Amino acid sequence: MAQTSTTLISSKSHLTSITGTDISFTATSGIFTIKATSTTLTGSGKLAVGDLITVTGTTSNNSTFTVSTVVSTLEVTVSEVVTSENSDGSTSVTLDHVGFVSDKAKGDGYYSQPDGVHTVAYQVTTSFNANATIKMQGTLATTPTEDDWFDIPGTTFTSDTSTVTSSANFTGNYVWVRSKTQLLTAGTVNSILLNS
């Protein structure tokens, strides 16, 4: 029987920026929240779990964050630490979609496989911007947090806007692996497939 590939990403595109004067940040008991009172943050064509957003226009939270939970159409939690900061109702805050991480997939270390051989295939559209990158990340943690992930050498794909398919082999007894797309300003990742 032929081995089947695990789909890490299936057709994920760059999203337009979200700007609002009602966006605030809250840090409470280790839960870090970005929320709005009327600006829609999630839903069709908006933010989802795994999206990377760069925040600008704030006093204390101009940084990149990973969406970890969608609470409602007006609220998300993020993996990274935010500083509590209320909106003032007049200052525009922008959430710029700059990439995404895939769900985690079991690596060879999960199954205690001795060879650790993995193959990944990336497929993007020709409109995928030239400085965007896709790379694989691994972890040895059984229940990883955002800080447990590290880049796997030799797996980075950078588009030249003409190459739309690329693959990489990598070796390691990673318990979990995932893909990470960064610096995305245009285009679509059609698919990322993994064989372990």
What spans do the regions from the language model cover?
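Short Trp-Ser/Thr-centered turn/loop motifs at beta-strand boundaries
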Residues: S5, S10-S13, H97-P114, T139, ...
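Beta-strand signatures of extracellular beta-sandwich domains
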Residues: L52-T54, T133-Q137
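Beta-sandwich interaction modules
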Residues: F100, D108-D115, F150-S196
